[in-house]
Structures are given as C-alpha cells and as structure tokens.
From Swiss-Prot:
PANTHER family reported for this sequence: BIOTIN SYNTHASE, BIOTIN SYNTHASE, MITOCHONDRIAL
Assembly and binders: Homodimer.
GO MF term list: 2 iron, 2 sulfur cluster binding; 4 iron, 4 sulfur cluster binding; biotin synthase activity; iron ion binding
Pathway note: Cofactor biosynthesis; biotin biosynthesis; biotin from 7,8-diaminononanoate: step 2/2
Name under which the protein is recorded: Biotin synthase
Top-level enzyme category: transferase
Native source organism of the sequence: Shewanella loihica (strain ATCC BAA-1088 / PV-4)
Pfam families: BATS, Radical_SAM
Gene this protein is translated from: bioB
Record note on cofactor: Binds 1 [4Fe-4S] cluster. The cluster is coordinated with 3 cysteines and an exchangeable S-adenosyl-L-methionine.
Transferase keyword on record: yes
Amino acid sequence: MSELALRHDWQRDEIEALFALPMNDLLFKAHSIHRQHFDPNEVQISRLLSIKTGACPEDCKYCPQSARYDTGLEKERLIEIEKVLTEARAAKAAGASRFCMGAAWRNPHERDMPYLKDMVSEVKAMGMETCMTLGMLSESQAKDLADAGLDYYNHNLDTSPEYYGDIITTRTYQDRLNTLDNVRAAGMKVCSGGIVGMGEQASDRAGLLQQLANMAKHPESVPINMLVKVAGTPFENLDDLDPLEFVRTIAVARIVMPLSRVRLSAGREKMTDELQAMCFFAGANSIFYGCKLLTTSNPEENEDMTLFKRLGLHPEQGKAGTVEEDKAVFAKAQAVKDKASQPFYDAAAL
C-alpha cells in the first residue's frame, strides 16, 4: 500500500465499529493488515533518555513530572552532553536503532536550542535515528532541530478532543496539533499517540485514533501508553483498564494506520508476557528497551530479550542471536553505561 492509498477520512462510528468487533475477528483483521506491510516477527527498538526531569509547569493529571503535584520526584536540570552520548552508545550496543531524548518542558527555551542541536548532531553521528520530545515547538525551533539532523519529534495527543479538557488545562488540543504541523513543515517524521486507562470511554479511544488516522500524513510512529498510576497525581486511584481493551486499541490503530510503527510504551512492566504477545499479534511492532521510562518502570532488558526468544521475535536491524550472545551484548552495553560519573533517569513515556 502506498502513502497515497491510505485513508484519511475515517468517521468516528466506523472506528467505534472496529472496537466493537468480536475479538477474534478484530485480531484476524489487524494481523492480516500487519503482515501485508511488515515482517510480523520484527520489532523496532528505541531507547529513551530523560535529559531534563521534573518541574514542568503543565497540569497533565497523569504526569509525575508536573510541578503542581507532590510525587516525591527529584527535579534535574538539563544534563551534560557527554552523559547523553554515554547513554546513546550503550543503547546502540544493546541493539536500539533509535535514541529518543525527552525534557519536561512546556516548550524549549531559545537559550537551550544550541545545546539541543549539538545533542542531536552528536547522537546522529553514531549512526542512530534521533527523536526528541520537548513540549511545544515554534516553526523556527522545528526547523532548527530538523537542520541539526533530528529524524523524529514526539508530541502526543493523549486522548480524544472531547475528553482532553478533563486531562489537561494548560495546553489546548489545537496547541498540540499546531506543534505537529510545525514538525511536518520542517521535514521531520512525526511520533504521536496517546494514553489509555485515564478514565476515558471507548468512544474517546476511537476519537484519539480518528484524529491520528485523519492527519494529512499518518504519524510514522504511534506510541500507545497504558496509564501508570503514580502516587501524588490526580489519577493515582483510577480503576485499571481491562487489558483486552488495550489490545483492542493496538489492533484498531494497526487497521486505521497500516504503515505506522505502533509502539508499546508506558505500562509494559505491568503487562503479562501473554498480554504483550497479544499486542504484538494485534500489530504492535515497536518497544522501548531499558529499565525506566522517564519516571516509571519498564521491563528489564533481559526480560525483553527472553520474551523475544519465546515469541520468535527479532529486532529491526538483524535477528537476535542466542540467549548467551544477547546476554553478552547487554553486558557490554552495561559496561559502557557504568563509565558515566553520575546516575540519571533513563526515559519518559512517549
């Protein structure tokens, strides 16, 4: 299927009808589409590093990085470039093909742009794809990052337009769409998805996917996060989402965005191997490697490696070796990381 053949005119009731399909029918449809466009046993691996943690002025009710909530998170300033490069080297040694850098900002300050551009160009020189998530971007900031070599920019829509106001009040839905427009205009690829399990209805999950699938060009990467409830945030006591509803969201995302990478993001640590296997079958074909996603836990690398072996999956760039060979790779990566003089956060959910 070419980009021109993709649909960009999905109606809400069409997507809701997909969500309502019997599970076997939905999974068959999603997996069939997945096999048409991807190696069904290949998974793209990214590593995500928090380059500036905490003290965000926004009021996103799910986020422990907001300065408005008492979550016990220690804020950190923008970290040194050498620490970023140390983590990037370790990520590459561990098999990651993309390195993502996230900062807890409403938007980057102009004084930080030269520093951010250096980060991008230095990581890019290692032969890895680069991604950043820094909040809202102006047209000029997007162009500067693109000129530095940034491949992807992440800016999630989070949920449907109708439910959005119950989640965030300090940034509008249109603000988010404007940033994505600036990213596209600068020539970068878009990474945009959302979070499920925030008390939304099934129609809101349909609404989120409708917004993404009806963009002039589908996001190249679509992260689907399961809410990680953090003490101190307004959402710490929400009821858990039925895991099968998460699988349905993955499957429908695959159907309406056939050429996009659908990423399992935050919440994987709480998922059973069986649930993750269902998600991969439903069309998920990207994950974050590493023990932490920003301030939330992520499966240990060895756990992911073992699961890949059990399911017969392999990273995007070449098939995995034996368990012993993979352990040697991860040991080498850890040795590189240990050279860093200070600990720092690994990542944030995209």
